Curated annotation (Swiss-Prot):
InterPro entries in the record: Restrct_endonuc-II-like, tRNA_endonuc-like_dom_sf, UPF0102_YraN-like
One MF annotation (Gene Ontology) recorded for this entry: nucleic acid binding
Protein name per UniProt: UPF0102 protein SO_0299
Family according to the record: Belongs to the UPF0102 family.
Pfam family, one: UPF0102
Length: 108
């Protein structure tokens, strides 16, 4: 298991402990990827997981670029359309630095 896969597993477990339900992991399209798809109450939650072993280059949260946000939004839109879902959604970020987990709800 790669570090990225370990981080995604840790993020999934953490979010499940917070009351979210797991739907799918690593949804890939030619134009973008969604790390985790979760459900929280009425929301479909698209989660980006960022991992850094230390606070290098600004930390995990700063590693999310505007271009990457655009690709995630496009992938989420395609996911909703392809699954024929007309539901509210949000975009969360789980930032993992060493052993610290930070969950940003409705991050972008």
């Amino acid at each position: 298991m790669t570090l990225g896969q370990q981080a995604e597993s840790l993020a999934q477990s953490y979010l499940e402990q917070q009351g979210l339900s797991f739907v799918e992991r690593n949804v890939r399209y030619p134009f973008g990827e969604i790390d985790l798809v979760m459900r929280h109450k009425k929301y479909w939650v698209f989660v980006e997981v960022k991992y850094r072993s230390a606070n290098q280059f600004g930390g995990a949260i700063q590693a999310l670029s505007k271009a990457q946000i655009g690709r995630i939004r496009m992938a989420a839109s395609h996911y909703l359309q392809s699954h024929k879902l007309d539901v509210p959604c949000r975009f969360d970020v789980v930032a993992i630095e060493d052993t610290q987990i930070q969950w940003l709800v409705d991050a972008f």
